[in-house]
Amino acid sequence: MLARTLVTPRLRLEATTPAHADGLWTATESSLSQLLVYMAWAPQASPENSRSYAERVAKRFDESIDWSFTVFHDDVVAGAISLMNYEAMFKVAEIGYWIRSDLAGRGLATEAARAVCDFGFDEVRLHRIELRAWVENAASIRIAEKLGFTREGLLREASWAQAGYQDMYIYGLLESDRKAAK
């Protein structure tokens, strides 16, 4: 049985359930102008879509397809983080995250990502975690570097959001990289 709650010094990450939908919507709404820049789903954000998202990812967690967590800081929803696009045959998943704008710059996304990478390697038994970051997203690039991810290449026009198609860097972290860094 996989852990459904991860605790770090400043955060509590709970496997996302429909009970988190309202908090996720509040966090999304408060950060919508920033999320629109990088997140393709942001233009469709709404209370109804937050509920639908929470229901969908809760089911996928239970089915060991994806693992999505709602991030809490001081008992307030601070954002979301997921291991997604799981390829069971190769033991590979991609990490994605966002933190509400008023909490940005405090290292919370790095702290949450470290906990989820540990969960991925220790509990899901992943071999590799991938991270994709827009080339202009300096904050996400810093997170990848702090966690020991290796930049492996450039994906041309691989993502779309409000600004149109954008290039992305792809990073990889192997379980052996993590062990070597400890």
Where are these regions (language model features)?
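Conserved GNAT-fold acetyl-CoA-binding loop/helix
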Residues: S33-E55
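A short hydrophobic/aromatic micro-motif that marks alpha-helical segments and, especially, helix-coil
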Residues: A45-P47, F61, R178-K179
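Short, polar/charged, Gly/Pro-enriched helix-capping and turn/loop motifs at alpha-helix termini
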Residues: Y38, A42, S64-S68, H127
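A short helix-loop-beta-strand connector motif used in the catalytic cores of GNAT acetyltransferases and
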Residues: E55-T70
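Acyl-donor (CoA/ACP) binding surface of acyl/acetyltransferases
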Residues: M1-G23, A27-Q34, S68-K182
